[in-house]
Amino acid sequence: MEFGISRKFAFLVQFRFLNCGKDSRGAEGGHWTERSEGSGWSSSGTPDSLVLTGLKNLQNCVSQDKPVCTLFSVPGKRTKPVKSHPKYKKFKNWHLTALIFFSAWVLFSAGCASQKNVVSSTQPEVFANNAEFYASTVTFKESFINLCFAGDIMAHKQNFSMSDYSIIWDGIRDITGSADLSFANIETTVDDFKECMSYPQFRINSDYVNEAVKAGFNVFSLANNHTNDWGLEGIKSTAEWAQKTADATEKSPRPVHFSGLKLDLIESGKMNNSGKDISFSYFEVRDWKILFVAATEILNRPEFSQYMNFSKPTKKVRRLFAEQLRNLRASHECDLFILSLHTAEPEYVFKTEMEQESFYKTLLNEACVDIIWANHPHVVKPWTVVKNSAYRENLLALKTKAISGTHGSNVDETVNADATVNVAESVLSDSKLIMRANGNTISGQRWDPKFNAPETLRDYTGDGLLLNVTFSKKVYTDSKHKKLFQTIELKSSQPCYITTYINSKWQFVIKKLDENFISELKKSGNKVWAEYLKSRKKIMEKTGENTIWQ
């Protein structure tokens, strides 16, 4: 039966009736029979059947002269059974009359609703204290996605001189390979027909970055200040590798995605208005739609910037960039909009200026970006979870509107905080994420660790962050499986600090900066590295997560 009763009488819809028999102590008397597990409703029972059951139970108790329990209870509170009383018989008829009166009133309030309602066993948790919602057939399907965000993949001489690139990633491939999407910024050009080059103009052969792909990384940013280190030739060779990798993995269980270069423009070689557009990657992971854009606000040289997503860090250009991003999302329905931004901030500086923070706020609120993944400083900065303070209120409003629109009930308008929301197109998010810099994932910058001074600024370049985040998506549908709205919630964010360790063979490899690795070093007799990384671990853990509400 579908209900349209007002909220203030909702508690009357949640019944708990007694059955006669022996209680838990073996004494003859009344005890509770729960008609629902936690929610106040069973998956198959209807309100009128509960009323009839209650009538029958009460009649049995009265006829058998058994003690009667309180028939109605407020959700979440249990009323203790009334003990037998000598004067009970004087009141049994009154109890029966009261039950009949309230039962008739509840059934009357239900109106001429259908008798076919069967409530799904998967009901939204926000409905738990609003019993009238349980009479609705609105249900949801929930799914999850796990994302891993790394930092910069650098290629100094110490890195590309190694004979086996695979061992670089052995220490973290269990993390990067298990996430649905693992993100990294490739801060070098890729060219198989040229020799590898280190700072200041980076170039690497594809076998170096292919090992990162094999380690599980499958989403790459190609837009940074080194993208045009080798001019248009370097841009083209990098684009060719990216396209080849994307094509080769397209039908694999783990396809690889790229953003940052304007591949169509690079292939055609034509200078036209397309150079003003943003290139992006738009793909699906199971039932999740992802929109990914990589852009840079800084270049080491001005030439050929039209072949990449380059946005100058001026107020005017930033406004236009935010507008472009907003329009891009409006034309591409997605569950998560992720922006990789190579910032124009100074390197090796931990503080983020207020102007940059203000730009991040614009990207989240006006450009409709969900996740900002920034890099360039080569050190780890704090990251921020931005909570939507109106989320619960708006979620309740959407659910109320959905039920009202589906069942025609006149729900109290005070809970409908957003009456203008188009329920069928609504996507409500509880949190957004700002990563200001995840440091170096691999580099040769800390080639001379200061074991006696681990707080040295240069030593920060040898440590990085893998931030693992899990999102939940709930798609709410009506009884005809028509989508009403959906929610996106950030369920968890787990940091894993990493370090570039130089082993006895002068190989630069990534290790987890944790107690296990430090203990391993101690057991092997490498006390110098053990003590150094113990100090580095304490330093890195000061760089953590903070939460703000807006």
Per-region residue spans from a language model:
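N-terminal catalytic scaffold of extracellular/periplasmic and nuclease hydrolases
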Residues: 118-231, 238, 249-250, 255-258
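Active-site-proximal beta-strand elements of phosphoester/diester hydrolases
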Residues: 146-152, 289-297, 338-340, 434-438
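Binuclear metal-dependent hydrolase catalytic cores centered on His/Asp/Glu-rich metal-binding motifs
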Residues: 160-162, 166-170, 203, 284-339, ...
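Short acidic, glycine-rich surface-loop motifs adjacent to enzyme active sites
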Residues: 179-191, 220-225, 299, 325-350
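Active-site-proximal segments of metal-dependent phosphoesterases and phosphodiesterases across multiple
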Residues: 193-213, 332-369
